[in-house]
């Protein structure tokens, strides 16, 4: 839906030379999508001044289970009375008014350029290392599977079979493979890469343009 709007000629004309603040609502993965949104807004001539993500802050595996419960039942409740309530927490929803107030103050003081930095300094935007690690690799894996399914279909393969295979792969990857990979990562890689990781967390938490070359 967001991409459809961003491609609309009337919308692109509307945001040209216009300050824009993006709001995100997701389970926990949003950085790849936001990179696309940033590029589209820049292409439209918009001035991205801020980005506020609202996510499920629960454990990745737990939130996958609770979100599934919410999707299949339509009930945003504690599964079996023991799991956390799925989705964006009531506390974060309540906190949204503070984000709005900060935006108003920034506009009134003509300091909208510092809006995002203020959000970060107040620790209102948090990007867990686990999510950063998973999402960066998930994009590559998705592209591999997308190309595989497309190529198999072009050669007369059964698309439904390969899509179902991908579905089961996702379940195995989420609940079996990722915990093992993350454990290895935090033991052997993370301690020696903290500076680079912090730079990446700052980049994705901010509204910076990726430098090329």
Language-model regions, residue ranges each:
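Membrane-proximal, acidic/low-complexity disordered segments on the non-cytosolic side
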Residues: 189-213
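A transmembrane-helix-recognition feature enriched in membrane-embedded lipid enzymes
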Residues: 157-197
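Cytosolic-side membrane-insertion boundary helix
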Residues: 149-159
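A conserved mid-domain beta-alpha-beta active-site/ligand-binding segment of alpha/beta enzyme cores
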Residues: 58-150
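Sequence-level detector for tyrosine residue identity
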Residues: 28, 54, 166-169, 185, ...
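Residue-level signal for alpha-helical context at structural boundaries
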Residues: 38, 55, 114, 194, ...
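Helix-loop-strand module that forms the ligand-binding subsite of alpha/beta enzymes
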Residues: 1-48, 52
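Short, well-ordered, mixed-charge alpha-helical segments that flank or form enzyme active sites
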Residues: 28-32, 57-62
């Amino acid at each position: 839906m967001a991409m459809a709007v961003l491609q609309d000629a009337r919308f692109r004309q509307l945001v040209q030379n216009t300050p824009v603040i993006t709001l995100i609502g997701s389970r926990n993965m949003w950085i790849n999508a936001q990179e696309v949104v940033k590029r589209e807004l820049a292409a439209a001539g918009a001035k991205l001044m801020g980005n506020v993500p609202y996510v499920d802050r629960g454990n990745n595996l737990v939130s996958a289970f609770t979100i599934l419960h919410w999707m299949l039942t339509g009930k945003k409740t504690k599964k079996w009375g023991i799991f956390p309530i799925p989705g964006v927490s009531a506390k974060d929803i309540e906190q949204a008014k503070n984000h709005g107030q900060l935006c108003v103050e920034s506009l009134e003081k003509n300091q909208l350029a510092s809006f995002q930095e203020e959000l970060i300094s107040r620790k209102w935007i948090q990007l867990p290392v686990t999510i950063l690690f998973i999402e960066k690799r998930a994009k590559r894996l998705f592209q591999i599977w997308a190309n595989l399914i497309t190529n198999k279909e072009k050669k007369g393969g059964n698309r439904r079979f390969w899509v179902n295979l991908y579905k089961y792969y996702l379940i195995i990857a989420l609940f079996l493979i990722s915990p093992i990979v993350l454990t290895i990562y935090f033991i052997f890689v993370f301690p020696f890469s903290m500076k680079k990781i912090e730079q990446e967390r700052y980049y994705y938490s901010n509204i910076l343009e990726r430098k090329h070359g």
